[in-house]
Regions:
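Hydrophobic transmembrane alpha-helices of multi-pass small-molecule transporters
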Residues: 91, 100-222, 323-344
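Structural signature of hydrophobic alpha-helical transmembrane segments
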Residues: 3-4, 171-179, 232-240, 287-291
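Transmembrane alpha-helices that form the ion-translocation and gating core
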Residues: 239-261
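Hydrophobic transmembrane alpha-helices that form the pore/transport pathway of multi-pass ion
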Residues: 1-62, 258-290, 340-342
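Juxtamembrane and boundary regions of transmembrane helices in multi-pass small-molecule transporters
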Residues: 40, 51, 62-127, 288-344
Length: 344
């Protein structure tokens, strides 16, 4: 998952915040939110590619919107949402020296060593040339995905079940990433045995079961009850098309996945007559699973914050991610609506 790269950043953010006497909750909570909001602006995310497929000309919606059209709206709107959430986070909570609970905690020498110990720096560290090679190989794979997504003519064409069309972008992403991974493994002196011990790999394996399993189950449920859902929501969405964003937000929380929510709800929106431009504008509404802190990146964020300032509240819903998430999504959807009115 594209958002899971944040696991490598959490320990760094926590250490720097503590060294600078900054309340770790301020940067860490919004970092977790930002990692998921960026999925809507990533050319290699399944959510964006799913939207490209749904809005393709073959779905009979008139004008087709491609990858670049979506990114032209999604990148500035998502970035603005993240910036607004970050600005709000600058002053959230008490400073560490004024936080009675934190000060009481560090009076225990063992707790103080646990919270402030273990900080390491990579400054003045010389990395092997293979580290730079692997970075550029990864960027090259992303560039290839963007290029293939921008121009269908570059993709091979296949005929499946008497229907001819270019290779799916879902498959293109998988192929490019697997090729890049194979090249890095062979050329950059990676020790295969150490891959399974990495934090990102472990988090990805957890995500496969905790996210993919839930998404698959919920997708099965929604597909079975789609006629009832369409009938129930049709009148609301047709009367007020903007309520599509609320429906998408709710379903996203239920399925814990942006891609699964879009796959289930975006085609329904088109079938109900929602304008394709609105689907692009409200793409950030597919990130609704911050409402309850059950997503792996949120749980990891809480675990990496040794100070305990990033947490789940007594009433569950009053957790560290709820307000940054709401600010980010509402801002992104609002700006997305304005940009689609101007640019598309």
């Amino acid at each position: 998952g594209t958002g899971h790269v944040v696991y490598t950043m959490f320990p760094i953010i926590a250490d720097i915040a503590l060294q600078k006497n900054i309340r770790p909750e301020r940067p860490m909570a919004v970092a977790s939110v930002a990692s998921q909001m960026a999925i809507c602006a990533s050319p290699v995310s399944v959510a964006v590619v799913s939207m490209v497929s749904i809005l393709a000309a073959g779905h009979g919606i008139g004008q087709a919107y491609g990858l670049l059209d979506i990114l032209m709206i999604a990148i500035p709107s998502s970035l603005t949402g993240v910036v607004m959430a970050a600005l709000w986070s600058l002053r959230r909570g008490k400073d560490l020296d004024k936080d009675e609970e934190f000060q009481a905690k560090i009076k225990d020498p063992a707790q103080r060593d646990f919270i402030y110990g273990g900080g390491e720096t990579l400054l003045n560290t010389k990395f092997p040339k293979e580290a730079y090679w692997s970075t550029w190989i990864f960027f090259a794979a992303i560039a290839a995905v963007v290029l293939l997504g921008a121009d269908e003519a570059l993709r091979p064409v296949f005929t499946i079940k008497e229907k001819t069309g270019p290779l799916s972008m879902n498959l293109v992403i998988q192929m490019m990433m697997l090729i890049a991974g194979a090249i890095i493994l062979m050329r950059c002196k990676v020790k295969p045995g150490e891959i399974a011990n990495g934090a990102v790999f472990k988090a990805g394996m957890v995500a496969i079961f905790s996210v993919f399993g839930v998404a698959w189950m919920s997708e099965t449920f929604f597909q079975a009850h789609m006629p009832l859902l369409k009938e129930t929501l049709a009148h609301v969405v047709q009367a007020q098309p903007w309520t599509y964003a609320l429906v998408l937000f709710l379903i996203s929380k239920l399925v814990n996945s942006q891609a699964a929510a879009l796959t289930a709800i975006a085609p329904m929106g088109l079938a109900l007559g929602v304008e394709p431009k609105l689907l692009i504008a409200f793409l950030p509404a597919s990130y609704g699973y911050f409402v309850l802190p059950t997503y792996p990146s949120d749980l990891a964020c809480i675990g990496f914050d040794r100070s305990g300032t990033t947490r789940i509240g007594k009433f569950i819903i009053n957790h560290s991610f709820i307000i940054p998430g709401l600010i980010g999504v509402v801002t992104s959807c609002t700006l997305g609506f304005i940009l689609t009115s101007i640019l598309l």
